[in-house]
Amino acid sequence: MSLEAEVPELGQDDSQRELTIKEEYQLWRKNCRYMYEFVSETALTWPSLTIQWLPENKTNEAEGLIDAKLLLGTHTSGEDTNYLKLASTQIPLSNSSNTEEKSNKKVTSRIKITKKFENNFEINRARYMPQDPSIVSTINGAGEIDLYNLGGDQKTAIAHFTPHEDNGYGLSWSPHKKGYLLTASDDKTVVLTDTSRLDATDLSQVCKFTTHKDIVNDAKWHQFDESLFGSVSDDKYFYLFDIRTPGEPVSKFYHPESEGINSLSFSPFSQYLVATGNANSNISLLDTRKLSTKSAVSDGLLHTMMGHSDSITSLEFSPHKDGMLASGSQDRRLILWDLFKVGEEQAQEDAEDGCPELFMMHAGHTGAVTDLSWCPYKDWTIGSVADDNIVHLWEIGKTLLNAEKGIELKDTDLE
């Protein structure tokens, strides 16, 4: 296990909140060995608002390591140049069933920055193109979109365009159609751009969606239908759009209890399931078949999950395990949810720890979680970043996973 933290000092303010954060962090470190196969912490000079594992990796069987790459950004608050950063690290294979051997082997998971690409403002999100991972898009604090070639020598963007008039966080490459890029912004719009029609000076904007009445916080492509995408906004709406009929959404969901909806994720396993992360700290599970075409209607809500204590910032379904969802929040927590446990009966002592679908809580960050990413080639492995300048890379422990399997077997036996 690697715990290579450079934890920033909390300062001399004796407020109850800071003392609580410090004590919680120390307790988390103490219990890491019981929860993780490995966990590493790396301090950055500036916080990163974005993280994503790149699919490129190299396995070293002899050393029991995987050479991995990550995308990070910077948020310098105007005090320094902002960059898209390409980072390298090593993570363990964790194939050994010998716990003592695993715990005694040193793993150097310190993140190293191997390339930097300049950007005009803080990078809110950076994502690689699925069909060509060497091409990366970013959206920044001015709503500007930049494309970079990770494999080239150019240290600046290969394309720069300004479809928005304000800060933006929504950024999603189509998994179906090469070059199709969705962006969403505080200017209340979602824009679809065809980056494959790039020449030296021009990008082709396919269409702009202007239905939302407030800040659009996120937009994501559907995992099964190449024509569908979803968007969420401070106007409390989730909209499902069809790019073949631009204009009004084909269906919608209204969330009256929340101050807004911050993020969404479509399931890669169930074509009708979408999760939304809300400003009121809850997560909504929706059935897209049951959504309404009318305004101010909440049809389609399957279940509400409660476990966070502050606004949801990021949401992503596992690419490996059906029904496993990760959420990050302003409350400094990252929660893994097992949707197959929704509605299970609980003993009273278990219910006090949370709802049955709350699978695990990662409590190692000392600042608001800004983004998370499932590793695409290694089960149960996640990268997460927070505004405390710390990057966490971690894999859920086999002990925890086996304990869950044991419970399932016991229930089966009882039936």
Swiss-Prot record:
Signal peptide: none annotated. Coiled coil: none annotated. It is found in: Cytoplasm; Nucleus. WD repeats lie at residues 118-158, 163-203, 211-251, 256-296, 307-347, 364-404. SUPFAM superfamilies: WD40 repeat-like. One of its GO terms (biological process) is chromatin organization. The record marks 273 as: Important for interaction with HAT1. GO terms for cellular component: cytoplasm; nucleus. InterPro entries: Histone-bd_RBBP4-like_N, WD40/YVTN_repeat-like_dom_sf, WD40_repeat_CS, WD40_repeat_dom_sf, WD40_rpt, WD_repeat_RBAP46/RBAP48/MSI1. Pfam families: CAF1C_H4-bd (PF12265), WD40 (PF00400). Component of the HAT-B complex composed of at least HAT1 and HAT2. The HAT-B complex binds to histone H4 tail. PANTHER family: WD40 REPEAT FAMILY. Belongs to the WD repeat RBAP46/RBAP48/MSI1 family. Regulatory subunit of the histone acetylase B (HAT-B) complex. The complex acetylates 'Lys-12' of histone H4 which is required for telomeric silencing. This is Histone acetyltransferase type B subunit 2.
